[in-house]
């Protein structure tokens, strides 16, 4: 076999090979024998089909399998010549030429190799971090909210008029064009007035009502209402208010702490204040990281961590970004790209910078995760998707299966690993006193979240 291999840089190589037709044909018998052991042809026992018949009936498959074997051997020899192990091959080779001549094939391909990444400048990439530590006023605000959230609802004076934050029990039925509609009726339905559990105009109409009072009022469903058969429709609602309950105020003291920190043996108000302060600090930290510092850190990693990137992976990422962009394009723009190969190439090329950055950051994050032993368990991926499903009203099992079918679980895991790696680097750059706050919160993270 005539083989030439050239290493372009530490992450890219190019091969040129001219395997003979004779080399290909030598593989036919062996492949045909494998097929003969599996196929069943009328008139012959399994495994007893003549090779000549197998070669005739399965000629296309034999040719394809032989070519794949030949390509794998070319690739194996190329890696050997480069002194590279198979595990260091990144992605699939990009075959730029594959032509069958009279006596041989002409094959040319670009090969992506695992890049060499030096992480000695990582600390230079991490921006200075200073998270706002919540003051006493912020802590007291959260304590008041906790006292409200944990308060029980109790019956009240029958003459009370419904106010925001009251718990109402109602019967209601809605009509469109004098006819009841699906989902428009309920009995003994509970809601917190002002919570936006129902449409705002519906809740406003209940303000000022008293127990046992009945009321009719018109309501127009928003044009973007989630139930399409109701969107933009005018309805008439009949409502009966059965009961009004109000929150029984809780004092901010040790008793509140025992309710909120139910898993703690000796919960006190001071401990609750400490936990609230820590929780508020974590919220401030997450907001600062997500809205500002993580993106700044990514930009610094992209700018300062320099290494060769496998071009085959960049091209694959460009294809992915281009395909994803097609889904959000107007039909006219998609047709314009379909009608003009030049425009399609230009549009695809516009994703090169984003693709290069994405590939680079993925390699850096992967290297950092391995160095710092940061990972994500499969169960954590499923928990994240389960939470997403619950928040969007989807069936968790269906959502997970959808991600699995579309081979997206690995992407979710990688995104979670990236988030942890970036947070880890930023946490290390926190002032000492703020790192101490983090350390105090970690043992309690799984116990109780306050607020």
From Swiss-Prot:
It catalyses: [protein]-peptidylproline (omega=180) = [protein]-peptidylproline (omega=0). The keyword Chaperone applies. It is found in: Cytoplasm. GO terms for biological process: 'de novo' cotranslational protein folding; cell division; chaperone-mediated protein folding; protein transport; protein unfolding. GO terms for cellular component: cytoplasm. Keywords: Cell cycle, Cell division, Chaperone, Cytoplasm, Isomerase, Rotamase. SUPFAM superfamilies: FKBP-like, Triger factor/SurA peptide-binding domain-like, Trigger factor ribosome-binding domain. It is an enzyme of class 5 (isomerase). Gene3D superfamilies: 3.10.50.40, Trigger factor ribosome-binding domain (3.30.70.1050), Trigger factor, C-terminal domain (1.10.3120.10). The keyword Cell division applies. Its main location: cytoplasm. PROSITE patterns: FKBP_PPIASE. It holds the Pfam family Trigger_C. Residues 165-250 form the PPIase FKBP-type domain. Its EC number is 5.2.1.8. GO terms for molecular function: peptidyl-prolyl cis-trans isomerase activity; protein folding chaperone; ribosome binding. Consists of 3 domains; the N-terminus binds the ribosome, the middle domain has PPIase activity, while the C-terminus has intrinsic chaperone activity on its own. Involved in protein export. Acts as a chaperone by maintaining the newly synthesized protein in an open conformation. Functions as a peptidyl-prolyl cis-trans isomerase. Belongs to the FKBP-type PPIase family. Tig subfamily. HAMAP family: Trigger_factor_Tig. This is Trigger factor. It comes from Helicobacter pylori (strain J99 / ATCC 700824).
């Amino acid at each position: 076999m005539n083989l030439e291999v050239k290493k372009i840089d530490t992450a890219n190589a190019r091969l040129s090979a001219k395997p003979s037709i004779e080399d290909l044909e030598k593989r036919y018998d062996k492949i045909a024998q494998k097929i003969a052991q599996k196929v069943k042809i009328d008139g012959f026992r399994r495994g007893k089909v003549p090779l000549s018949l197998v070669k005739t009936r399965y000629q296309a498959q034999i040719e394809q399998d032989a070519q794949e074997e030949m390509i794998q051997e070319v690739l194996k020899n190329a890696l050997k010549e480069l002194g590279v192990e198979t595990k260091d091959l990144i992605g699939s080779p990009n075959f730029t030429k594959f032509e069958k001549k009279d006596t041989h094939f002409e094959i040319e391909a670009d090969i992506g190799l695992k890049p060499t990444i030096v992480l000695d400048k990582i600390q230079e990439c991490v921006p200075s971090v200073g998270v706002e530590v919540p003051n006493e006023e912020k802590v007291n605000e959260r304590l008041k909210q906790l006292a409200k959230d944990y308060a029980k609802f109790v019956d009240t004076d029958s003459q009370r008029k419904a106010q925001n934050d009251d718990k109402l029990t109602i019967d209601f039925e809605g009509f469109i064009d004098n006819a009841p509609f699906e989902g428009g009726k309920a009995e003994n339905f509970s809601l917190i007035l002002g919570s936006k559990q129902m449409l705002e105009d519906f809740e406003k109409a209940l303000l000022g009502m008293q127990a046992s009072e009945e009321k009719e009022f018109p309501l127009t469903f928003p044009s973007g209402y989630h139930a399409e058969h109701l969107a933009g429709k005018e309805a008439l609602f009949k409502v009966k208010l059965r009961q009004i309950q109000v929150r029984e105020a809780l004092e901010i003291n040790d008793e509140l702490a025992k309710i909120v920190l139910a898993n703690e043996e000796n919960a006190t108000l001071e401990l609750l204040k400490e936990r609230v302060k820590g929780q508020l600090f974590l919220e401030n930290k997450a907001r600062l990281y997500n809205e500002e510092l993580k993106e700044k850190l990514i930009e610094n990693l992209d700018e300062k961590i320099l290494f060769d990137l496998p071009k085959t992976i960049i091209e694959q990422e460009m294809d992915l970004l281009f395909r994803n962009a097609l889904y959000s394009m107007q039909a006219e723009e998609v047709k314009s790209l379909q009608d003009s190969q030049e425009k399609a190439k230009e549009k695809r090329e516009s994703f090169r910078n984003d693709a290069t950055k994405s590939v680079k950051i993925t390699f850096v994050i992967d290297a950092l995760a391995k160095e710092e032993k940061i990972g994500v368990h499969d169960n954590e991926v499923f928990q994240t998707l389960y939470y997403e499903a619950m928040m969007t009203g989807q069936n968790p099992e269906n959502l997970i299966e959808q991600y699995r079918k579309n081979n997206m679980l690995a992407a979710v895991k990688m995104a979670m690993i990236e988030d942890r790696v970036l947070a880890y680097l930023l946490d290390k750059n926190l002032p000492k006193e703020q790192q101490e706050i983090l350390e105090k919160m970690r043992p309690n993270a799984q116990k109780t979240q306050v607020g």
